[in-house]
């Protein structure tokens, strides 16, 4: 990892150059494909990795090859992964879902913004240079209508978003013909239902039951539909956002694009610094993935960082502001109740959630119940009008191994289950946030408790970190826990970067965190037995055994690092066709030796077969033609 430290000005200039030169880019030897649905505007993007053929025989002059079919993989990069699409972040992305939203005739443009804060920002000419120029006119559900995907699902309606998701979740595996690639071990799903083929109707059923959510605000039409649920692929979230001391709008847009390139299924904007409103607008207009926020952060900024001065009115205005910009899901810490706060007094690390600590301080200062809990039904009404999903925050999550699975954590979890049922009364989509810091032997209980008390709503966890002794490597400590809880049924994993507990992550940290968590999510899919999850592994193993080095690089989650590590010791082009690597060398490569053994065994088998035929021939008297026996 590079240790070169850029100045603040250099970081911002680098981000500006990135934005100015941004273009759709494919991974090495990959191409963008689109799988079409039942109507012309359902075009589901995937990345197809092209592979080289396998040498199967012949001689030096006339070698004989066998084709290796391309491998389709899930792609979160949106237009940024398509070289044929022109990118201009100042214009934003195409509004993919706008025709679907308009066709439902259940929402209408607003004549003015509902948020007083938004109105004030728009009236401030001093912000013109920072403001995204192509502002949308926000929409809201018309009176008496509900615009959530949960509402449609409960009405028996299969939306275009649901069909898009069904195609996407199947990952193009119906295109794979090779029996070698299709082989897969049986998994242990711990009660998950994983059909061989995901249909739009199955997606609808899961959403209707509350077991899955489709974060898709009607004011974020640029987003490509995706789903979060135990019976689908495990998803990964990346956190970005500025702080009071670092980052800029340019850098956050760069981190957004970078996150989607490296596999972020959703992105949370956790900005706490200046220009939060303007930064979020730039992010939303350029994001092909759902965007989540923690509204209490911005609400706190509006009262100058003094938690005691927070009010429901300020928070409500913040919800309206963000919903009309297009935020797809809100983290709401409504389960931090006044009576739970004393339970944290005996903890080693107390309350470590920012949102949880803000609400705990407010409750103690006023000696009143959490206003998010008291006004939860009003929160649901707002979410239902824009289709903002709720991510019920775990404000009392454990911040150390010592505090794992304690009374405070599980008391809050049970309250989140109660709030889930209330949200469902309003047809609002819900997922539940989880820990945190949990040792390996205690992780599964978190999943079983959540399923029981939160009625199978999707679980979304931060890790969990399995040990506290590795600052600088907490993407590893948490990746272990993430893989485990993903296997047990967690639907989405919030990444942890190497900077966890140390500082705000930069672009390279974002990549490191995402690669770690894509590994964890994929390992969980394999363990669950998700249909088709093993195809890419099989393709990699076949390429590895056949010494197809270029294919090994290209099939990797990070082709660039794989190639760089190989080329550190074998940089010559001849090293890309060598039947060994620098680990063992030519004489001790186990796969080379195995191939020689296999070839020898095959040759021996042929020779033995020829000998048997020769013996049979002589036993029959050496006659070329045998007389037919009479009946």
Curated annotation (Swiss-Prot):
Keywords attached to this entry: 4Fe-4S, Iron, Iron-sulfur, Lyase, Metal-binding, S-adenosyl-L-methionine, Thiamine biosynthesis, Zinc
Q: What reaction is this protein's catalytic activity?
A: 5-amino-1-(5-phospho-beta-D-ribosyl)imidazole + S-adenosyl-L-methionine = 4-amino-2-methyl-5-(phosphooxymethyl)pyrimidine + CO + 5'-deoxyadenosine + formate + L-methionine + 3 H(+)
- Note the InterPro entries from the entry: ThiC, ThiC-associated_dom, ThiC/Bza_core_dom, ThiC/BzaA/B
In this chain, the stretch annotated as Disordered covers 54-80
Record GO terms (molecular function): 4 iron, 4 sulfur cluster binding; carbon-carbon lyase activity; zinc ion binding
Q: What class of enzyme is it?
A: lyase
As recorded in UniProt, its EC number(s) are 4.1.99.17
Q: Where is the composition biased (Basic and acidic residues)?
A: 58-67
Q: Which cofactor does it need?
A: [4Fe-4S] cluster
Comment on bound cofactor: Binds 1 [4Fe-4S] cluster per subunit. The cluster is coordinated with 3 cysteines and an exchangeable S-adenosyl-L-methionine.
Chain residues that bind Zn(2+): 437, 501
Q: Which GO terms describe its cellular component?
A: cytosol
GO BP term (any one) = thiamine diphosphate biosynthetic process
Write out the pathway annotation from the protein's UniProt entry: Cofactor biosynthesis; thiamine diphosphate biosynthesis
User: How is the subunit organization of this protein annotated in UniProt?
Assistant: Homodimer.
Function (record text): Catalyzes the synthesis of the hydroxymethylpyrimidine phosphate (HMP-P) moiety of thiamine from aminoimidazole ribotide (AIR) in a radical S-adenosyl-L-methionine (SAM)-dependent reaction.
Q: What is this protein called?
A: Phosphomethylpyrimidine synthase
The record lists the organism as: Klebsiella pneumoniae subsp. pneumoniae (strain ATCC 700721 / MGH 78578)
Gene (name only): thiC
């Amino acid at each position: 990892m590079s240790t070169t430290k850029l100045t603040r000005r250099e970081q911002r200039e680098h981000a500006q150059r990135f934005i100015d030169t941004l273009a759709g880019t494919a991974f090495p030897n990959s191409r963008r494909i689109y799988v079409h649905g039942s109507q012309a505007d359902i075009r589901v993007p995937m990345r197809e990795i092209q592979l080289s053929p396998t040498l199967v025989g012949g001689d030096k002059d006339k070698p004989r090859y066998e084709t290796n079919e391309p491998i389709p993989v899930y792609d979160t990069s949106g237009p940024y992964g398509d070289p044929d699409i022109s990118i201009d972040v100042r214009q934003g992305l195409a509004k993919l879902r706008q025709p679907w939203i308009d066709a439902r005739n259940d929402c209408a443009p607003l004549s003015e913004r509902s948020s007083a804060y938004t109105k004030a920002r728009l009236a401030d000419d001093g912000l013109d240079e920072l403001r995204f120029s192509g502002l949308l006119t926000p929409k809201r559900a018309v009176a008496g209508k509900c615009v959530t995907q949960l509402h449609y699902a409960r009405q028996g309606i299969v939306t275009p978003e649901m069909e898009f998701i069904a195609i996407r979740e199947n990952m193009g595996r119906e295109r794979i013909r090779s029996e070698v690639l299709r082989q897969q071990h049986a998994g242990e799903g711990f009660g998950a239902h994983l059909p061989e083929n995901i249909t739009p109707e199955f997606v609808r059923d899961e959403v209707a039951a509350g077991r899955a959510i489709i974060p898709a605000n009607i004011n974020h039409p640029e987003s490509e539909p995706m789903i979060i649920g135990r019976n689908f692929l495990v998803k990964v979230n990346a956190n970005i956002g500025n702080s009071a001391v670092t980052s800029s709008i340019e850098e956050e847009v760069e981190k957004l694009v970078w996150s989607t390139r490296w596999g972020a299924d959703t992105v949370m904007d956790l900005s706490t610094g200046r220009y939060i409103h303007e930064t979020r607008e730039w992010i939303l207009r350029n994001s092909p993935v759902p965007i989540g926020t923690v509204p209490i952060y911005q609400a706190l900024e509006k009262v100058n960082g003094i938690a005691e001065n927070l009010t429901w009115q300020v928070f409500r205005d913040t919800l309206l502001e963000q919903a009309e910009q297009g935020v797809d899901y809100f983290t709401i810490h409504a389960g931090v109740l006044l009576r739970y706060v004393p339970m944290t007094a005996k903890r080693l690390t107390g309350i470590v959630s920012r949102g949880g600590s803000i609400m705990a301080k407010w409750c103690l200062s006023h000696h009143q119940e959490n206003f998010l809990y008291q006004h939860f039904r009003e929160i649901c009404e707002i979410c239902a009008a824009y289709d903002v999903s709720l991510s019920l925050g775990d404000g009392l999550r454990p911040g150390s191994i010592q505090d794992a699975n304690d009374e405070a954590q599980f008391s809050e979890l049970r309250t989140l289950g109660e709030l889930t049922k209330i949200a469902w009364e309003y047809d609002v989509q819900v997922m539940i946030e989880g820990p945190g810091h949990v040792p390996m032997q205690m992780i599964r209980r978190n999943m079983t408790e959540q399923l029981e008390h939160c009625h199978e709503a999707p679980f979304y966890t931060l890790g969990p970190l399995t040990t506290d002794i590795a600052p600088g490597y907490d993407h590893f400590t948490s990746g272990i826990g993430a893989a485990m809880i993903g296997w047990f049924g967690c639907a989405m994993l919030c990444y942890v970067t190497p900077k966890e507990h140390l500082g705000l992550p930069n672009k390279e940290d974002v990549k490191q965190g995402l690669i770690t968590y894509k590994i964890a999510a994929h390992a969980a899919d394999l363990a669950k037995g998700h249909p088709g999850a093993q195809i890419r592994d099989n393709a990699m193993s076949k390429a590895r055994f056949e010494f197809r080095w270029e294919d090994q690089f290209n099939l990797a989650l990070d082709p660039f690092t794989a190639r760089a590590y190989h080329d550190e010791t074998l940089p010559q082009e001849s090293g890309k066709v060598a039947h060994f690597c620098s680990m063992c060398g030519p004489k001790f490569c186990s796969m080379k030796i195995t191939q020689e053994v296999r070839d020898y065994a095959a040759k021996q088998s042929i020779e033995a077969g020829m000998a048997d035929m020769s013996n049979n021939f002589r036993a029959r008297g050496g006659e070329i033609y045998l007389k037919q026996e009479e009946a």
